[in-house]
């Protein structure tokens, strides 16, 4: 039977050694689902609230016992006593949203609500004897995503003196996900050897990318291009580049202040100058995607950027849209960006996540399913990417098990789909004039 008989949460650790929420759901027939909730380092101010305890004597205030308590003492009784079916995802998600009663899930915590939402879906898939991607996407989910591999970390994700948070490679010329992953791994290892030859640090940051002390942004880009070529691939043909500027991290009082991360070598740019700078970079290098090129509240700047280069480059809103359909709807109406980053914990339920993806795709925007810098062994985002035919996934570099787990899950899915599996490569960027 599909009736949920038990919902239980506990405090566990994420990839940074910080507490996070794990939730387990059990049905009367024995179907079981478990979910672990990710956490971000650079967060948009409009994100759903991640509930932390604030008790400095425990995990430096980052404990999640209150969120765990909210699952065990508030959400669980509602679900169990209400005799909810594990197959009724939308009703359960809506019930939790109403139970919280705030616009940002600040009462119960998005980390509490999301853990339950995903665990319910996993238990439903288990009940039906289906893989999660098939339960979520039905027979239509068969497109493997182009991986955006964050092989150099800057900004808030490392100690490197570079403002941009992520430098990514996208193996769009590969014929399958398996091949794209191999290309990425080969480029990653070639980059490591180039860094070693230069006497640069090869330790990795939160998302598994290198965080060496490059001389600046262009040094990082040119070094990545050398690694692509050394691995035997052609930049701008086999493999493209991407940035996550995370501009909100260095924007203040109308100024994009690169000195925050780059010291005396950094520039201070107005919105117009920031647009000029990004346009200059895409003219010089094979860049296909830029995330958060402008501050989340600089909508005028975003409009300038979209009008200037939005037909040539994917412009992804992360802090801008925070997986929120209300904000995305406004962006679509005003012609802001052409893509949304999808992070399940920014909004807090699977139902709302799928609504955001559907809205984006209907408007001709791409949807990039993404991890967070604080991750776990949970691989739900891999299944979501395939279930929704998102076409793109961002889940870190080619090291650290918390990142590789997602890639390995995609390999399994591709194997399972066999001849029905699709990998569209460059065609996944249907929002551009290619």
UniProtKB/Swiss-Prot annotation:
GO terms for molecular function: magnesium ion binding; phosphopyruvate hydratase activity. It is found in: Cytoplasm; Secreted; Cell surface. The active site is at residues 207, 343. Keywords: Cytoplasm, Glycolysis, Lyase, Magnesium, Metal-binding, Secreted. The keyword Cell membrane does not apply. Binds a second Mg(2+) ion via substrate during catalysis. It catalyses: (2R)-2-phosphoglycerate = phosphoenolpyruvate + H2O. Pathway: Carbohydrate degradation; glycolysis; pyruvate from D-glyceraldehyde 3-phosphate: step 4/5. Its EC number is 4.2.1.11. Its cofactor is Mg(2+). GO terms for biological process: glycolytic process. (2R)-2-phosphoglycerate binds at residues 165, 343, 372-373, 394. Mg(2+) binds at residues 244, 291, 318. GO terms for cellular component: cell surface; extracellular region; phosphopyruvate hydratase complex. Catalyzes the reversible conversion of 2-phosphoglycerate (2-PG) into phosphoenolpyruvate (PEP). It is essential for the degradation of carbohydrates via glycolysis. NCBIfam families: eno (TIGR01060). Belongs to the enolase family. This is Enolase. It comes from Staphylococcus haemolyticus (strain JCSC1435).
């Amino acid at each position: 039977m599909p009736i949920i008989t038990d919902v239980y949460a506990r405090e566990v650790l994420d990839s940074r050694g910080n507490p996070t929420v794990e939730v387990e759901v059990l049905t009367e027939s024995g179907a079981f689902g478990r979910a672990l909730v990710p956490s971000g380092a650079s967060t948009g101010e409009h994100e759903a609230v991640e509930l932390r305890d604030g008790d400095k004597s425990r995990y430096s205030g980052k404990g999640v016992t209150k969120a765990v308590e909210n699952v065990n003492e508030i959400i669980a009784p509602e679900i169990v006593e209400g005799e909810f079916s594990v197959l009724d995802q939308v009703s359960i998600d809506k019930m939790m949203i109403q139970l919280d009663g705030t616009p940002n899930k600040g009462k119960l915590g998005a980390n509490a609500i999301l853990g339950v939402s995903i665990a319910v879906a996993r238990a439903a898939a288990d009940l039906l004897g289906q893989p999660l991607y098939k339960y979520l996407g039905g027979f239509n989910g068969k497109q493997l995503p182009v991986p955006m591999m964050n092989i150099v970390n800057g900004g808030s994700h490392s100690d490197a003196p570079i403002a941009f948070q992520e430098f990514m490679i996208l193996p769009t010329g590969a014929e399958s996900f398996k091949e794209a992953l191999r290309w990425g791994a080969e480029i990653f290892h070639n980059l490591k050897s180039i860094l070693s030859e230069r006497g640069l640090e090869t330790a990795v940051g939160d998302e598994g990318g290198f965080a060496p002390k490059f001389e600046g942004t262009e040094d990082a880009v040119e070094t990545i291009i050398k690694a692509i070529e050394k691995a035997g691939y052609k930049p701008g043909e086999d493999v493209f580049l991407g940035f996550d500027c995370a501009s909100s991290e260095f924007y203040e009082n109308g100024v994009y202040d690169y000195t925050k991360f780059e010291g005396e070598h950094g520039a201070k740019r107005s919105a117009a100058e920031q647009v000029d700078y990004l346009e200059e970079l895409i003219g010089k290098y094979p860049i296909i995607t830029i995330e958060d090129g402008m501050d989340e509240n600089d909508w005028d700047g975003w409009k300038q950027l979209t009008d200037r280069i939005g037909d040539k480059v994917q412009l992804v809103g992360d802090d801008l849209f925070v997986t929120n359909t209300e904000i995305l709807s406004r962006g679509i109406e005003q012609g802001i960006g052409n893509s949304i980053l999808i992070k399940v914990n920014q909004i807090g339920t699977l139902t709302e996540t799928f609504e955001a993806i559907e809205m984006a795709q209907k408007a001709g925007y791409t949807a990039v399913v993404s991890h967070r810098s604080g991750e776990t062994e949970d691989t739900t985002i891999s299944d979501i990417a395939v279930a929704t035919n998102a076409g793109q996934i961002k889940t870190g570099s080619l090291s650290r098990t918390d990142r590789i787990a997602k890639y390995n899950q995609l390999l399994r899915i591709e194997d399972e789909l066999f001849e029905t599996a699709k990998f569209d490569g460059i065609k996944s960027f249907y929002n551009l004039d290619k």
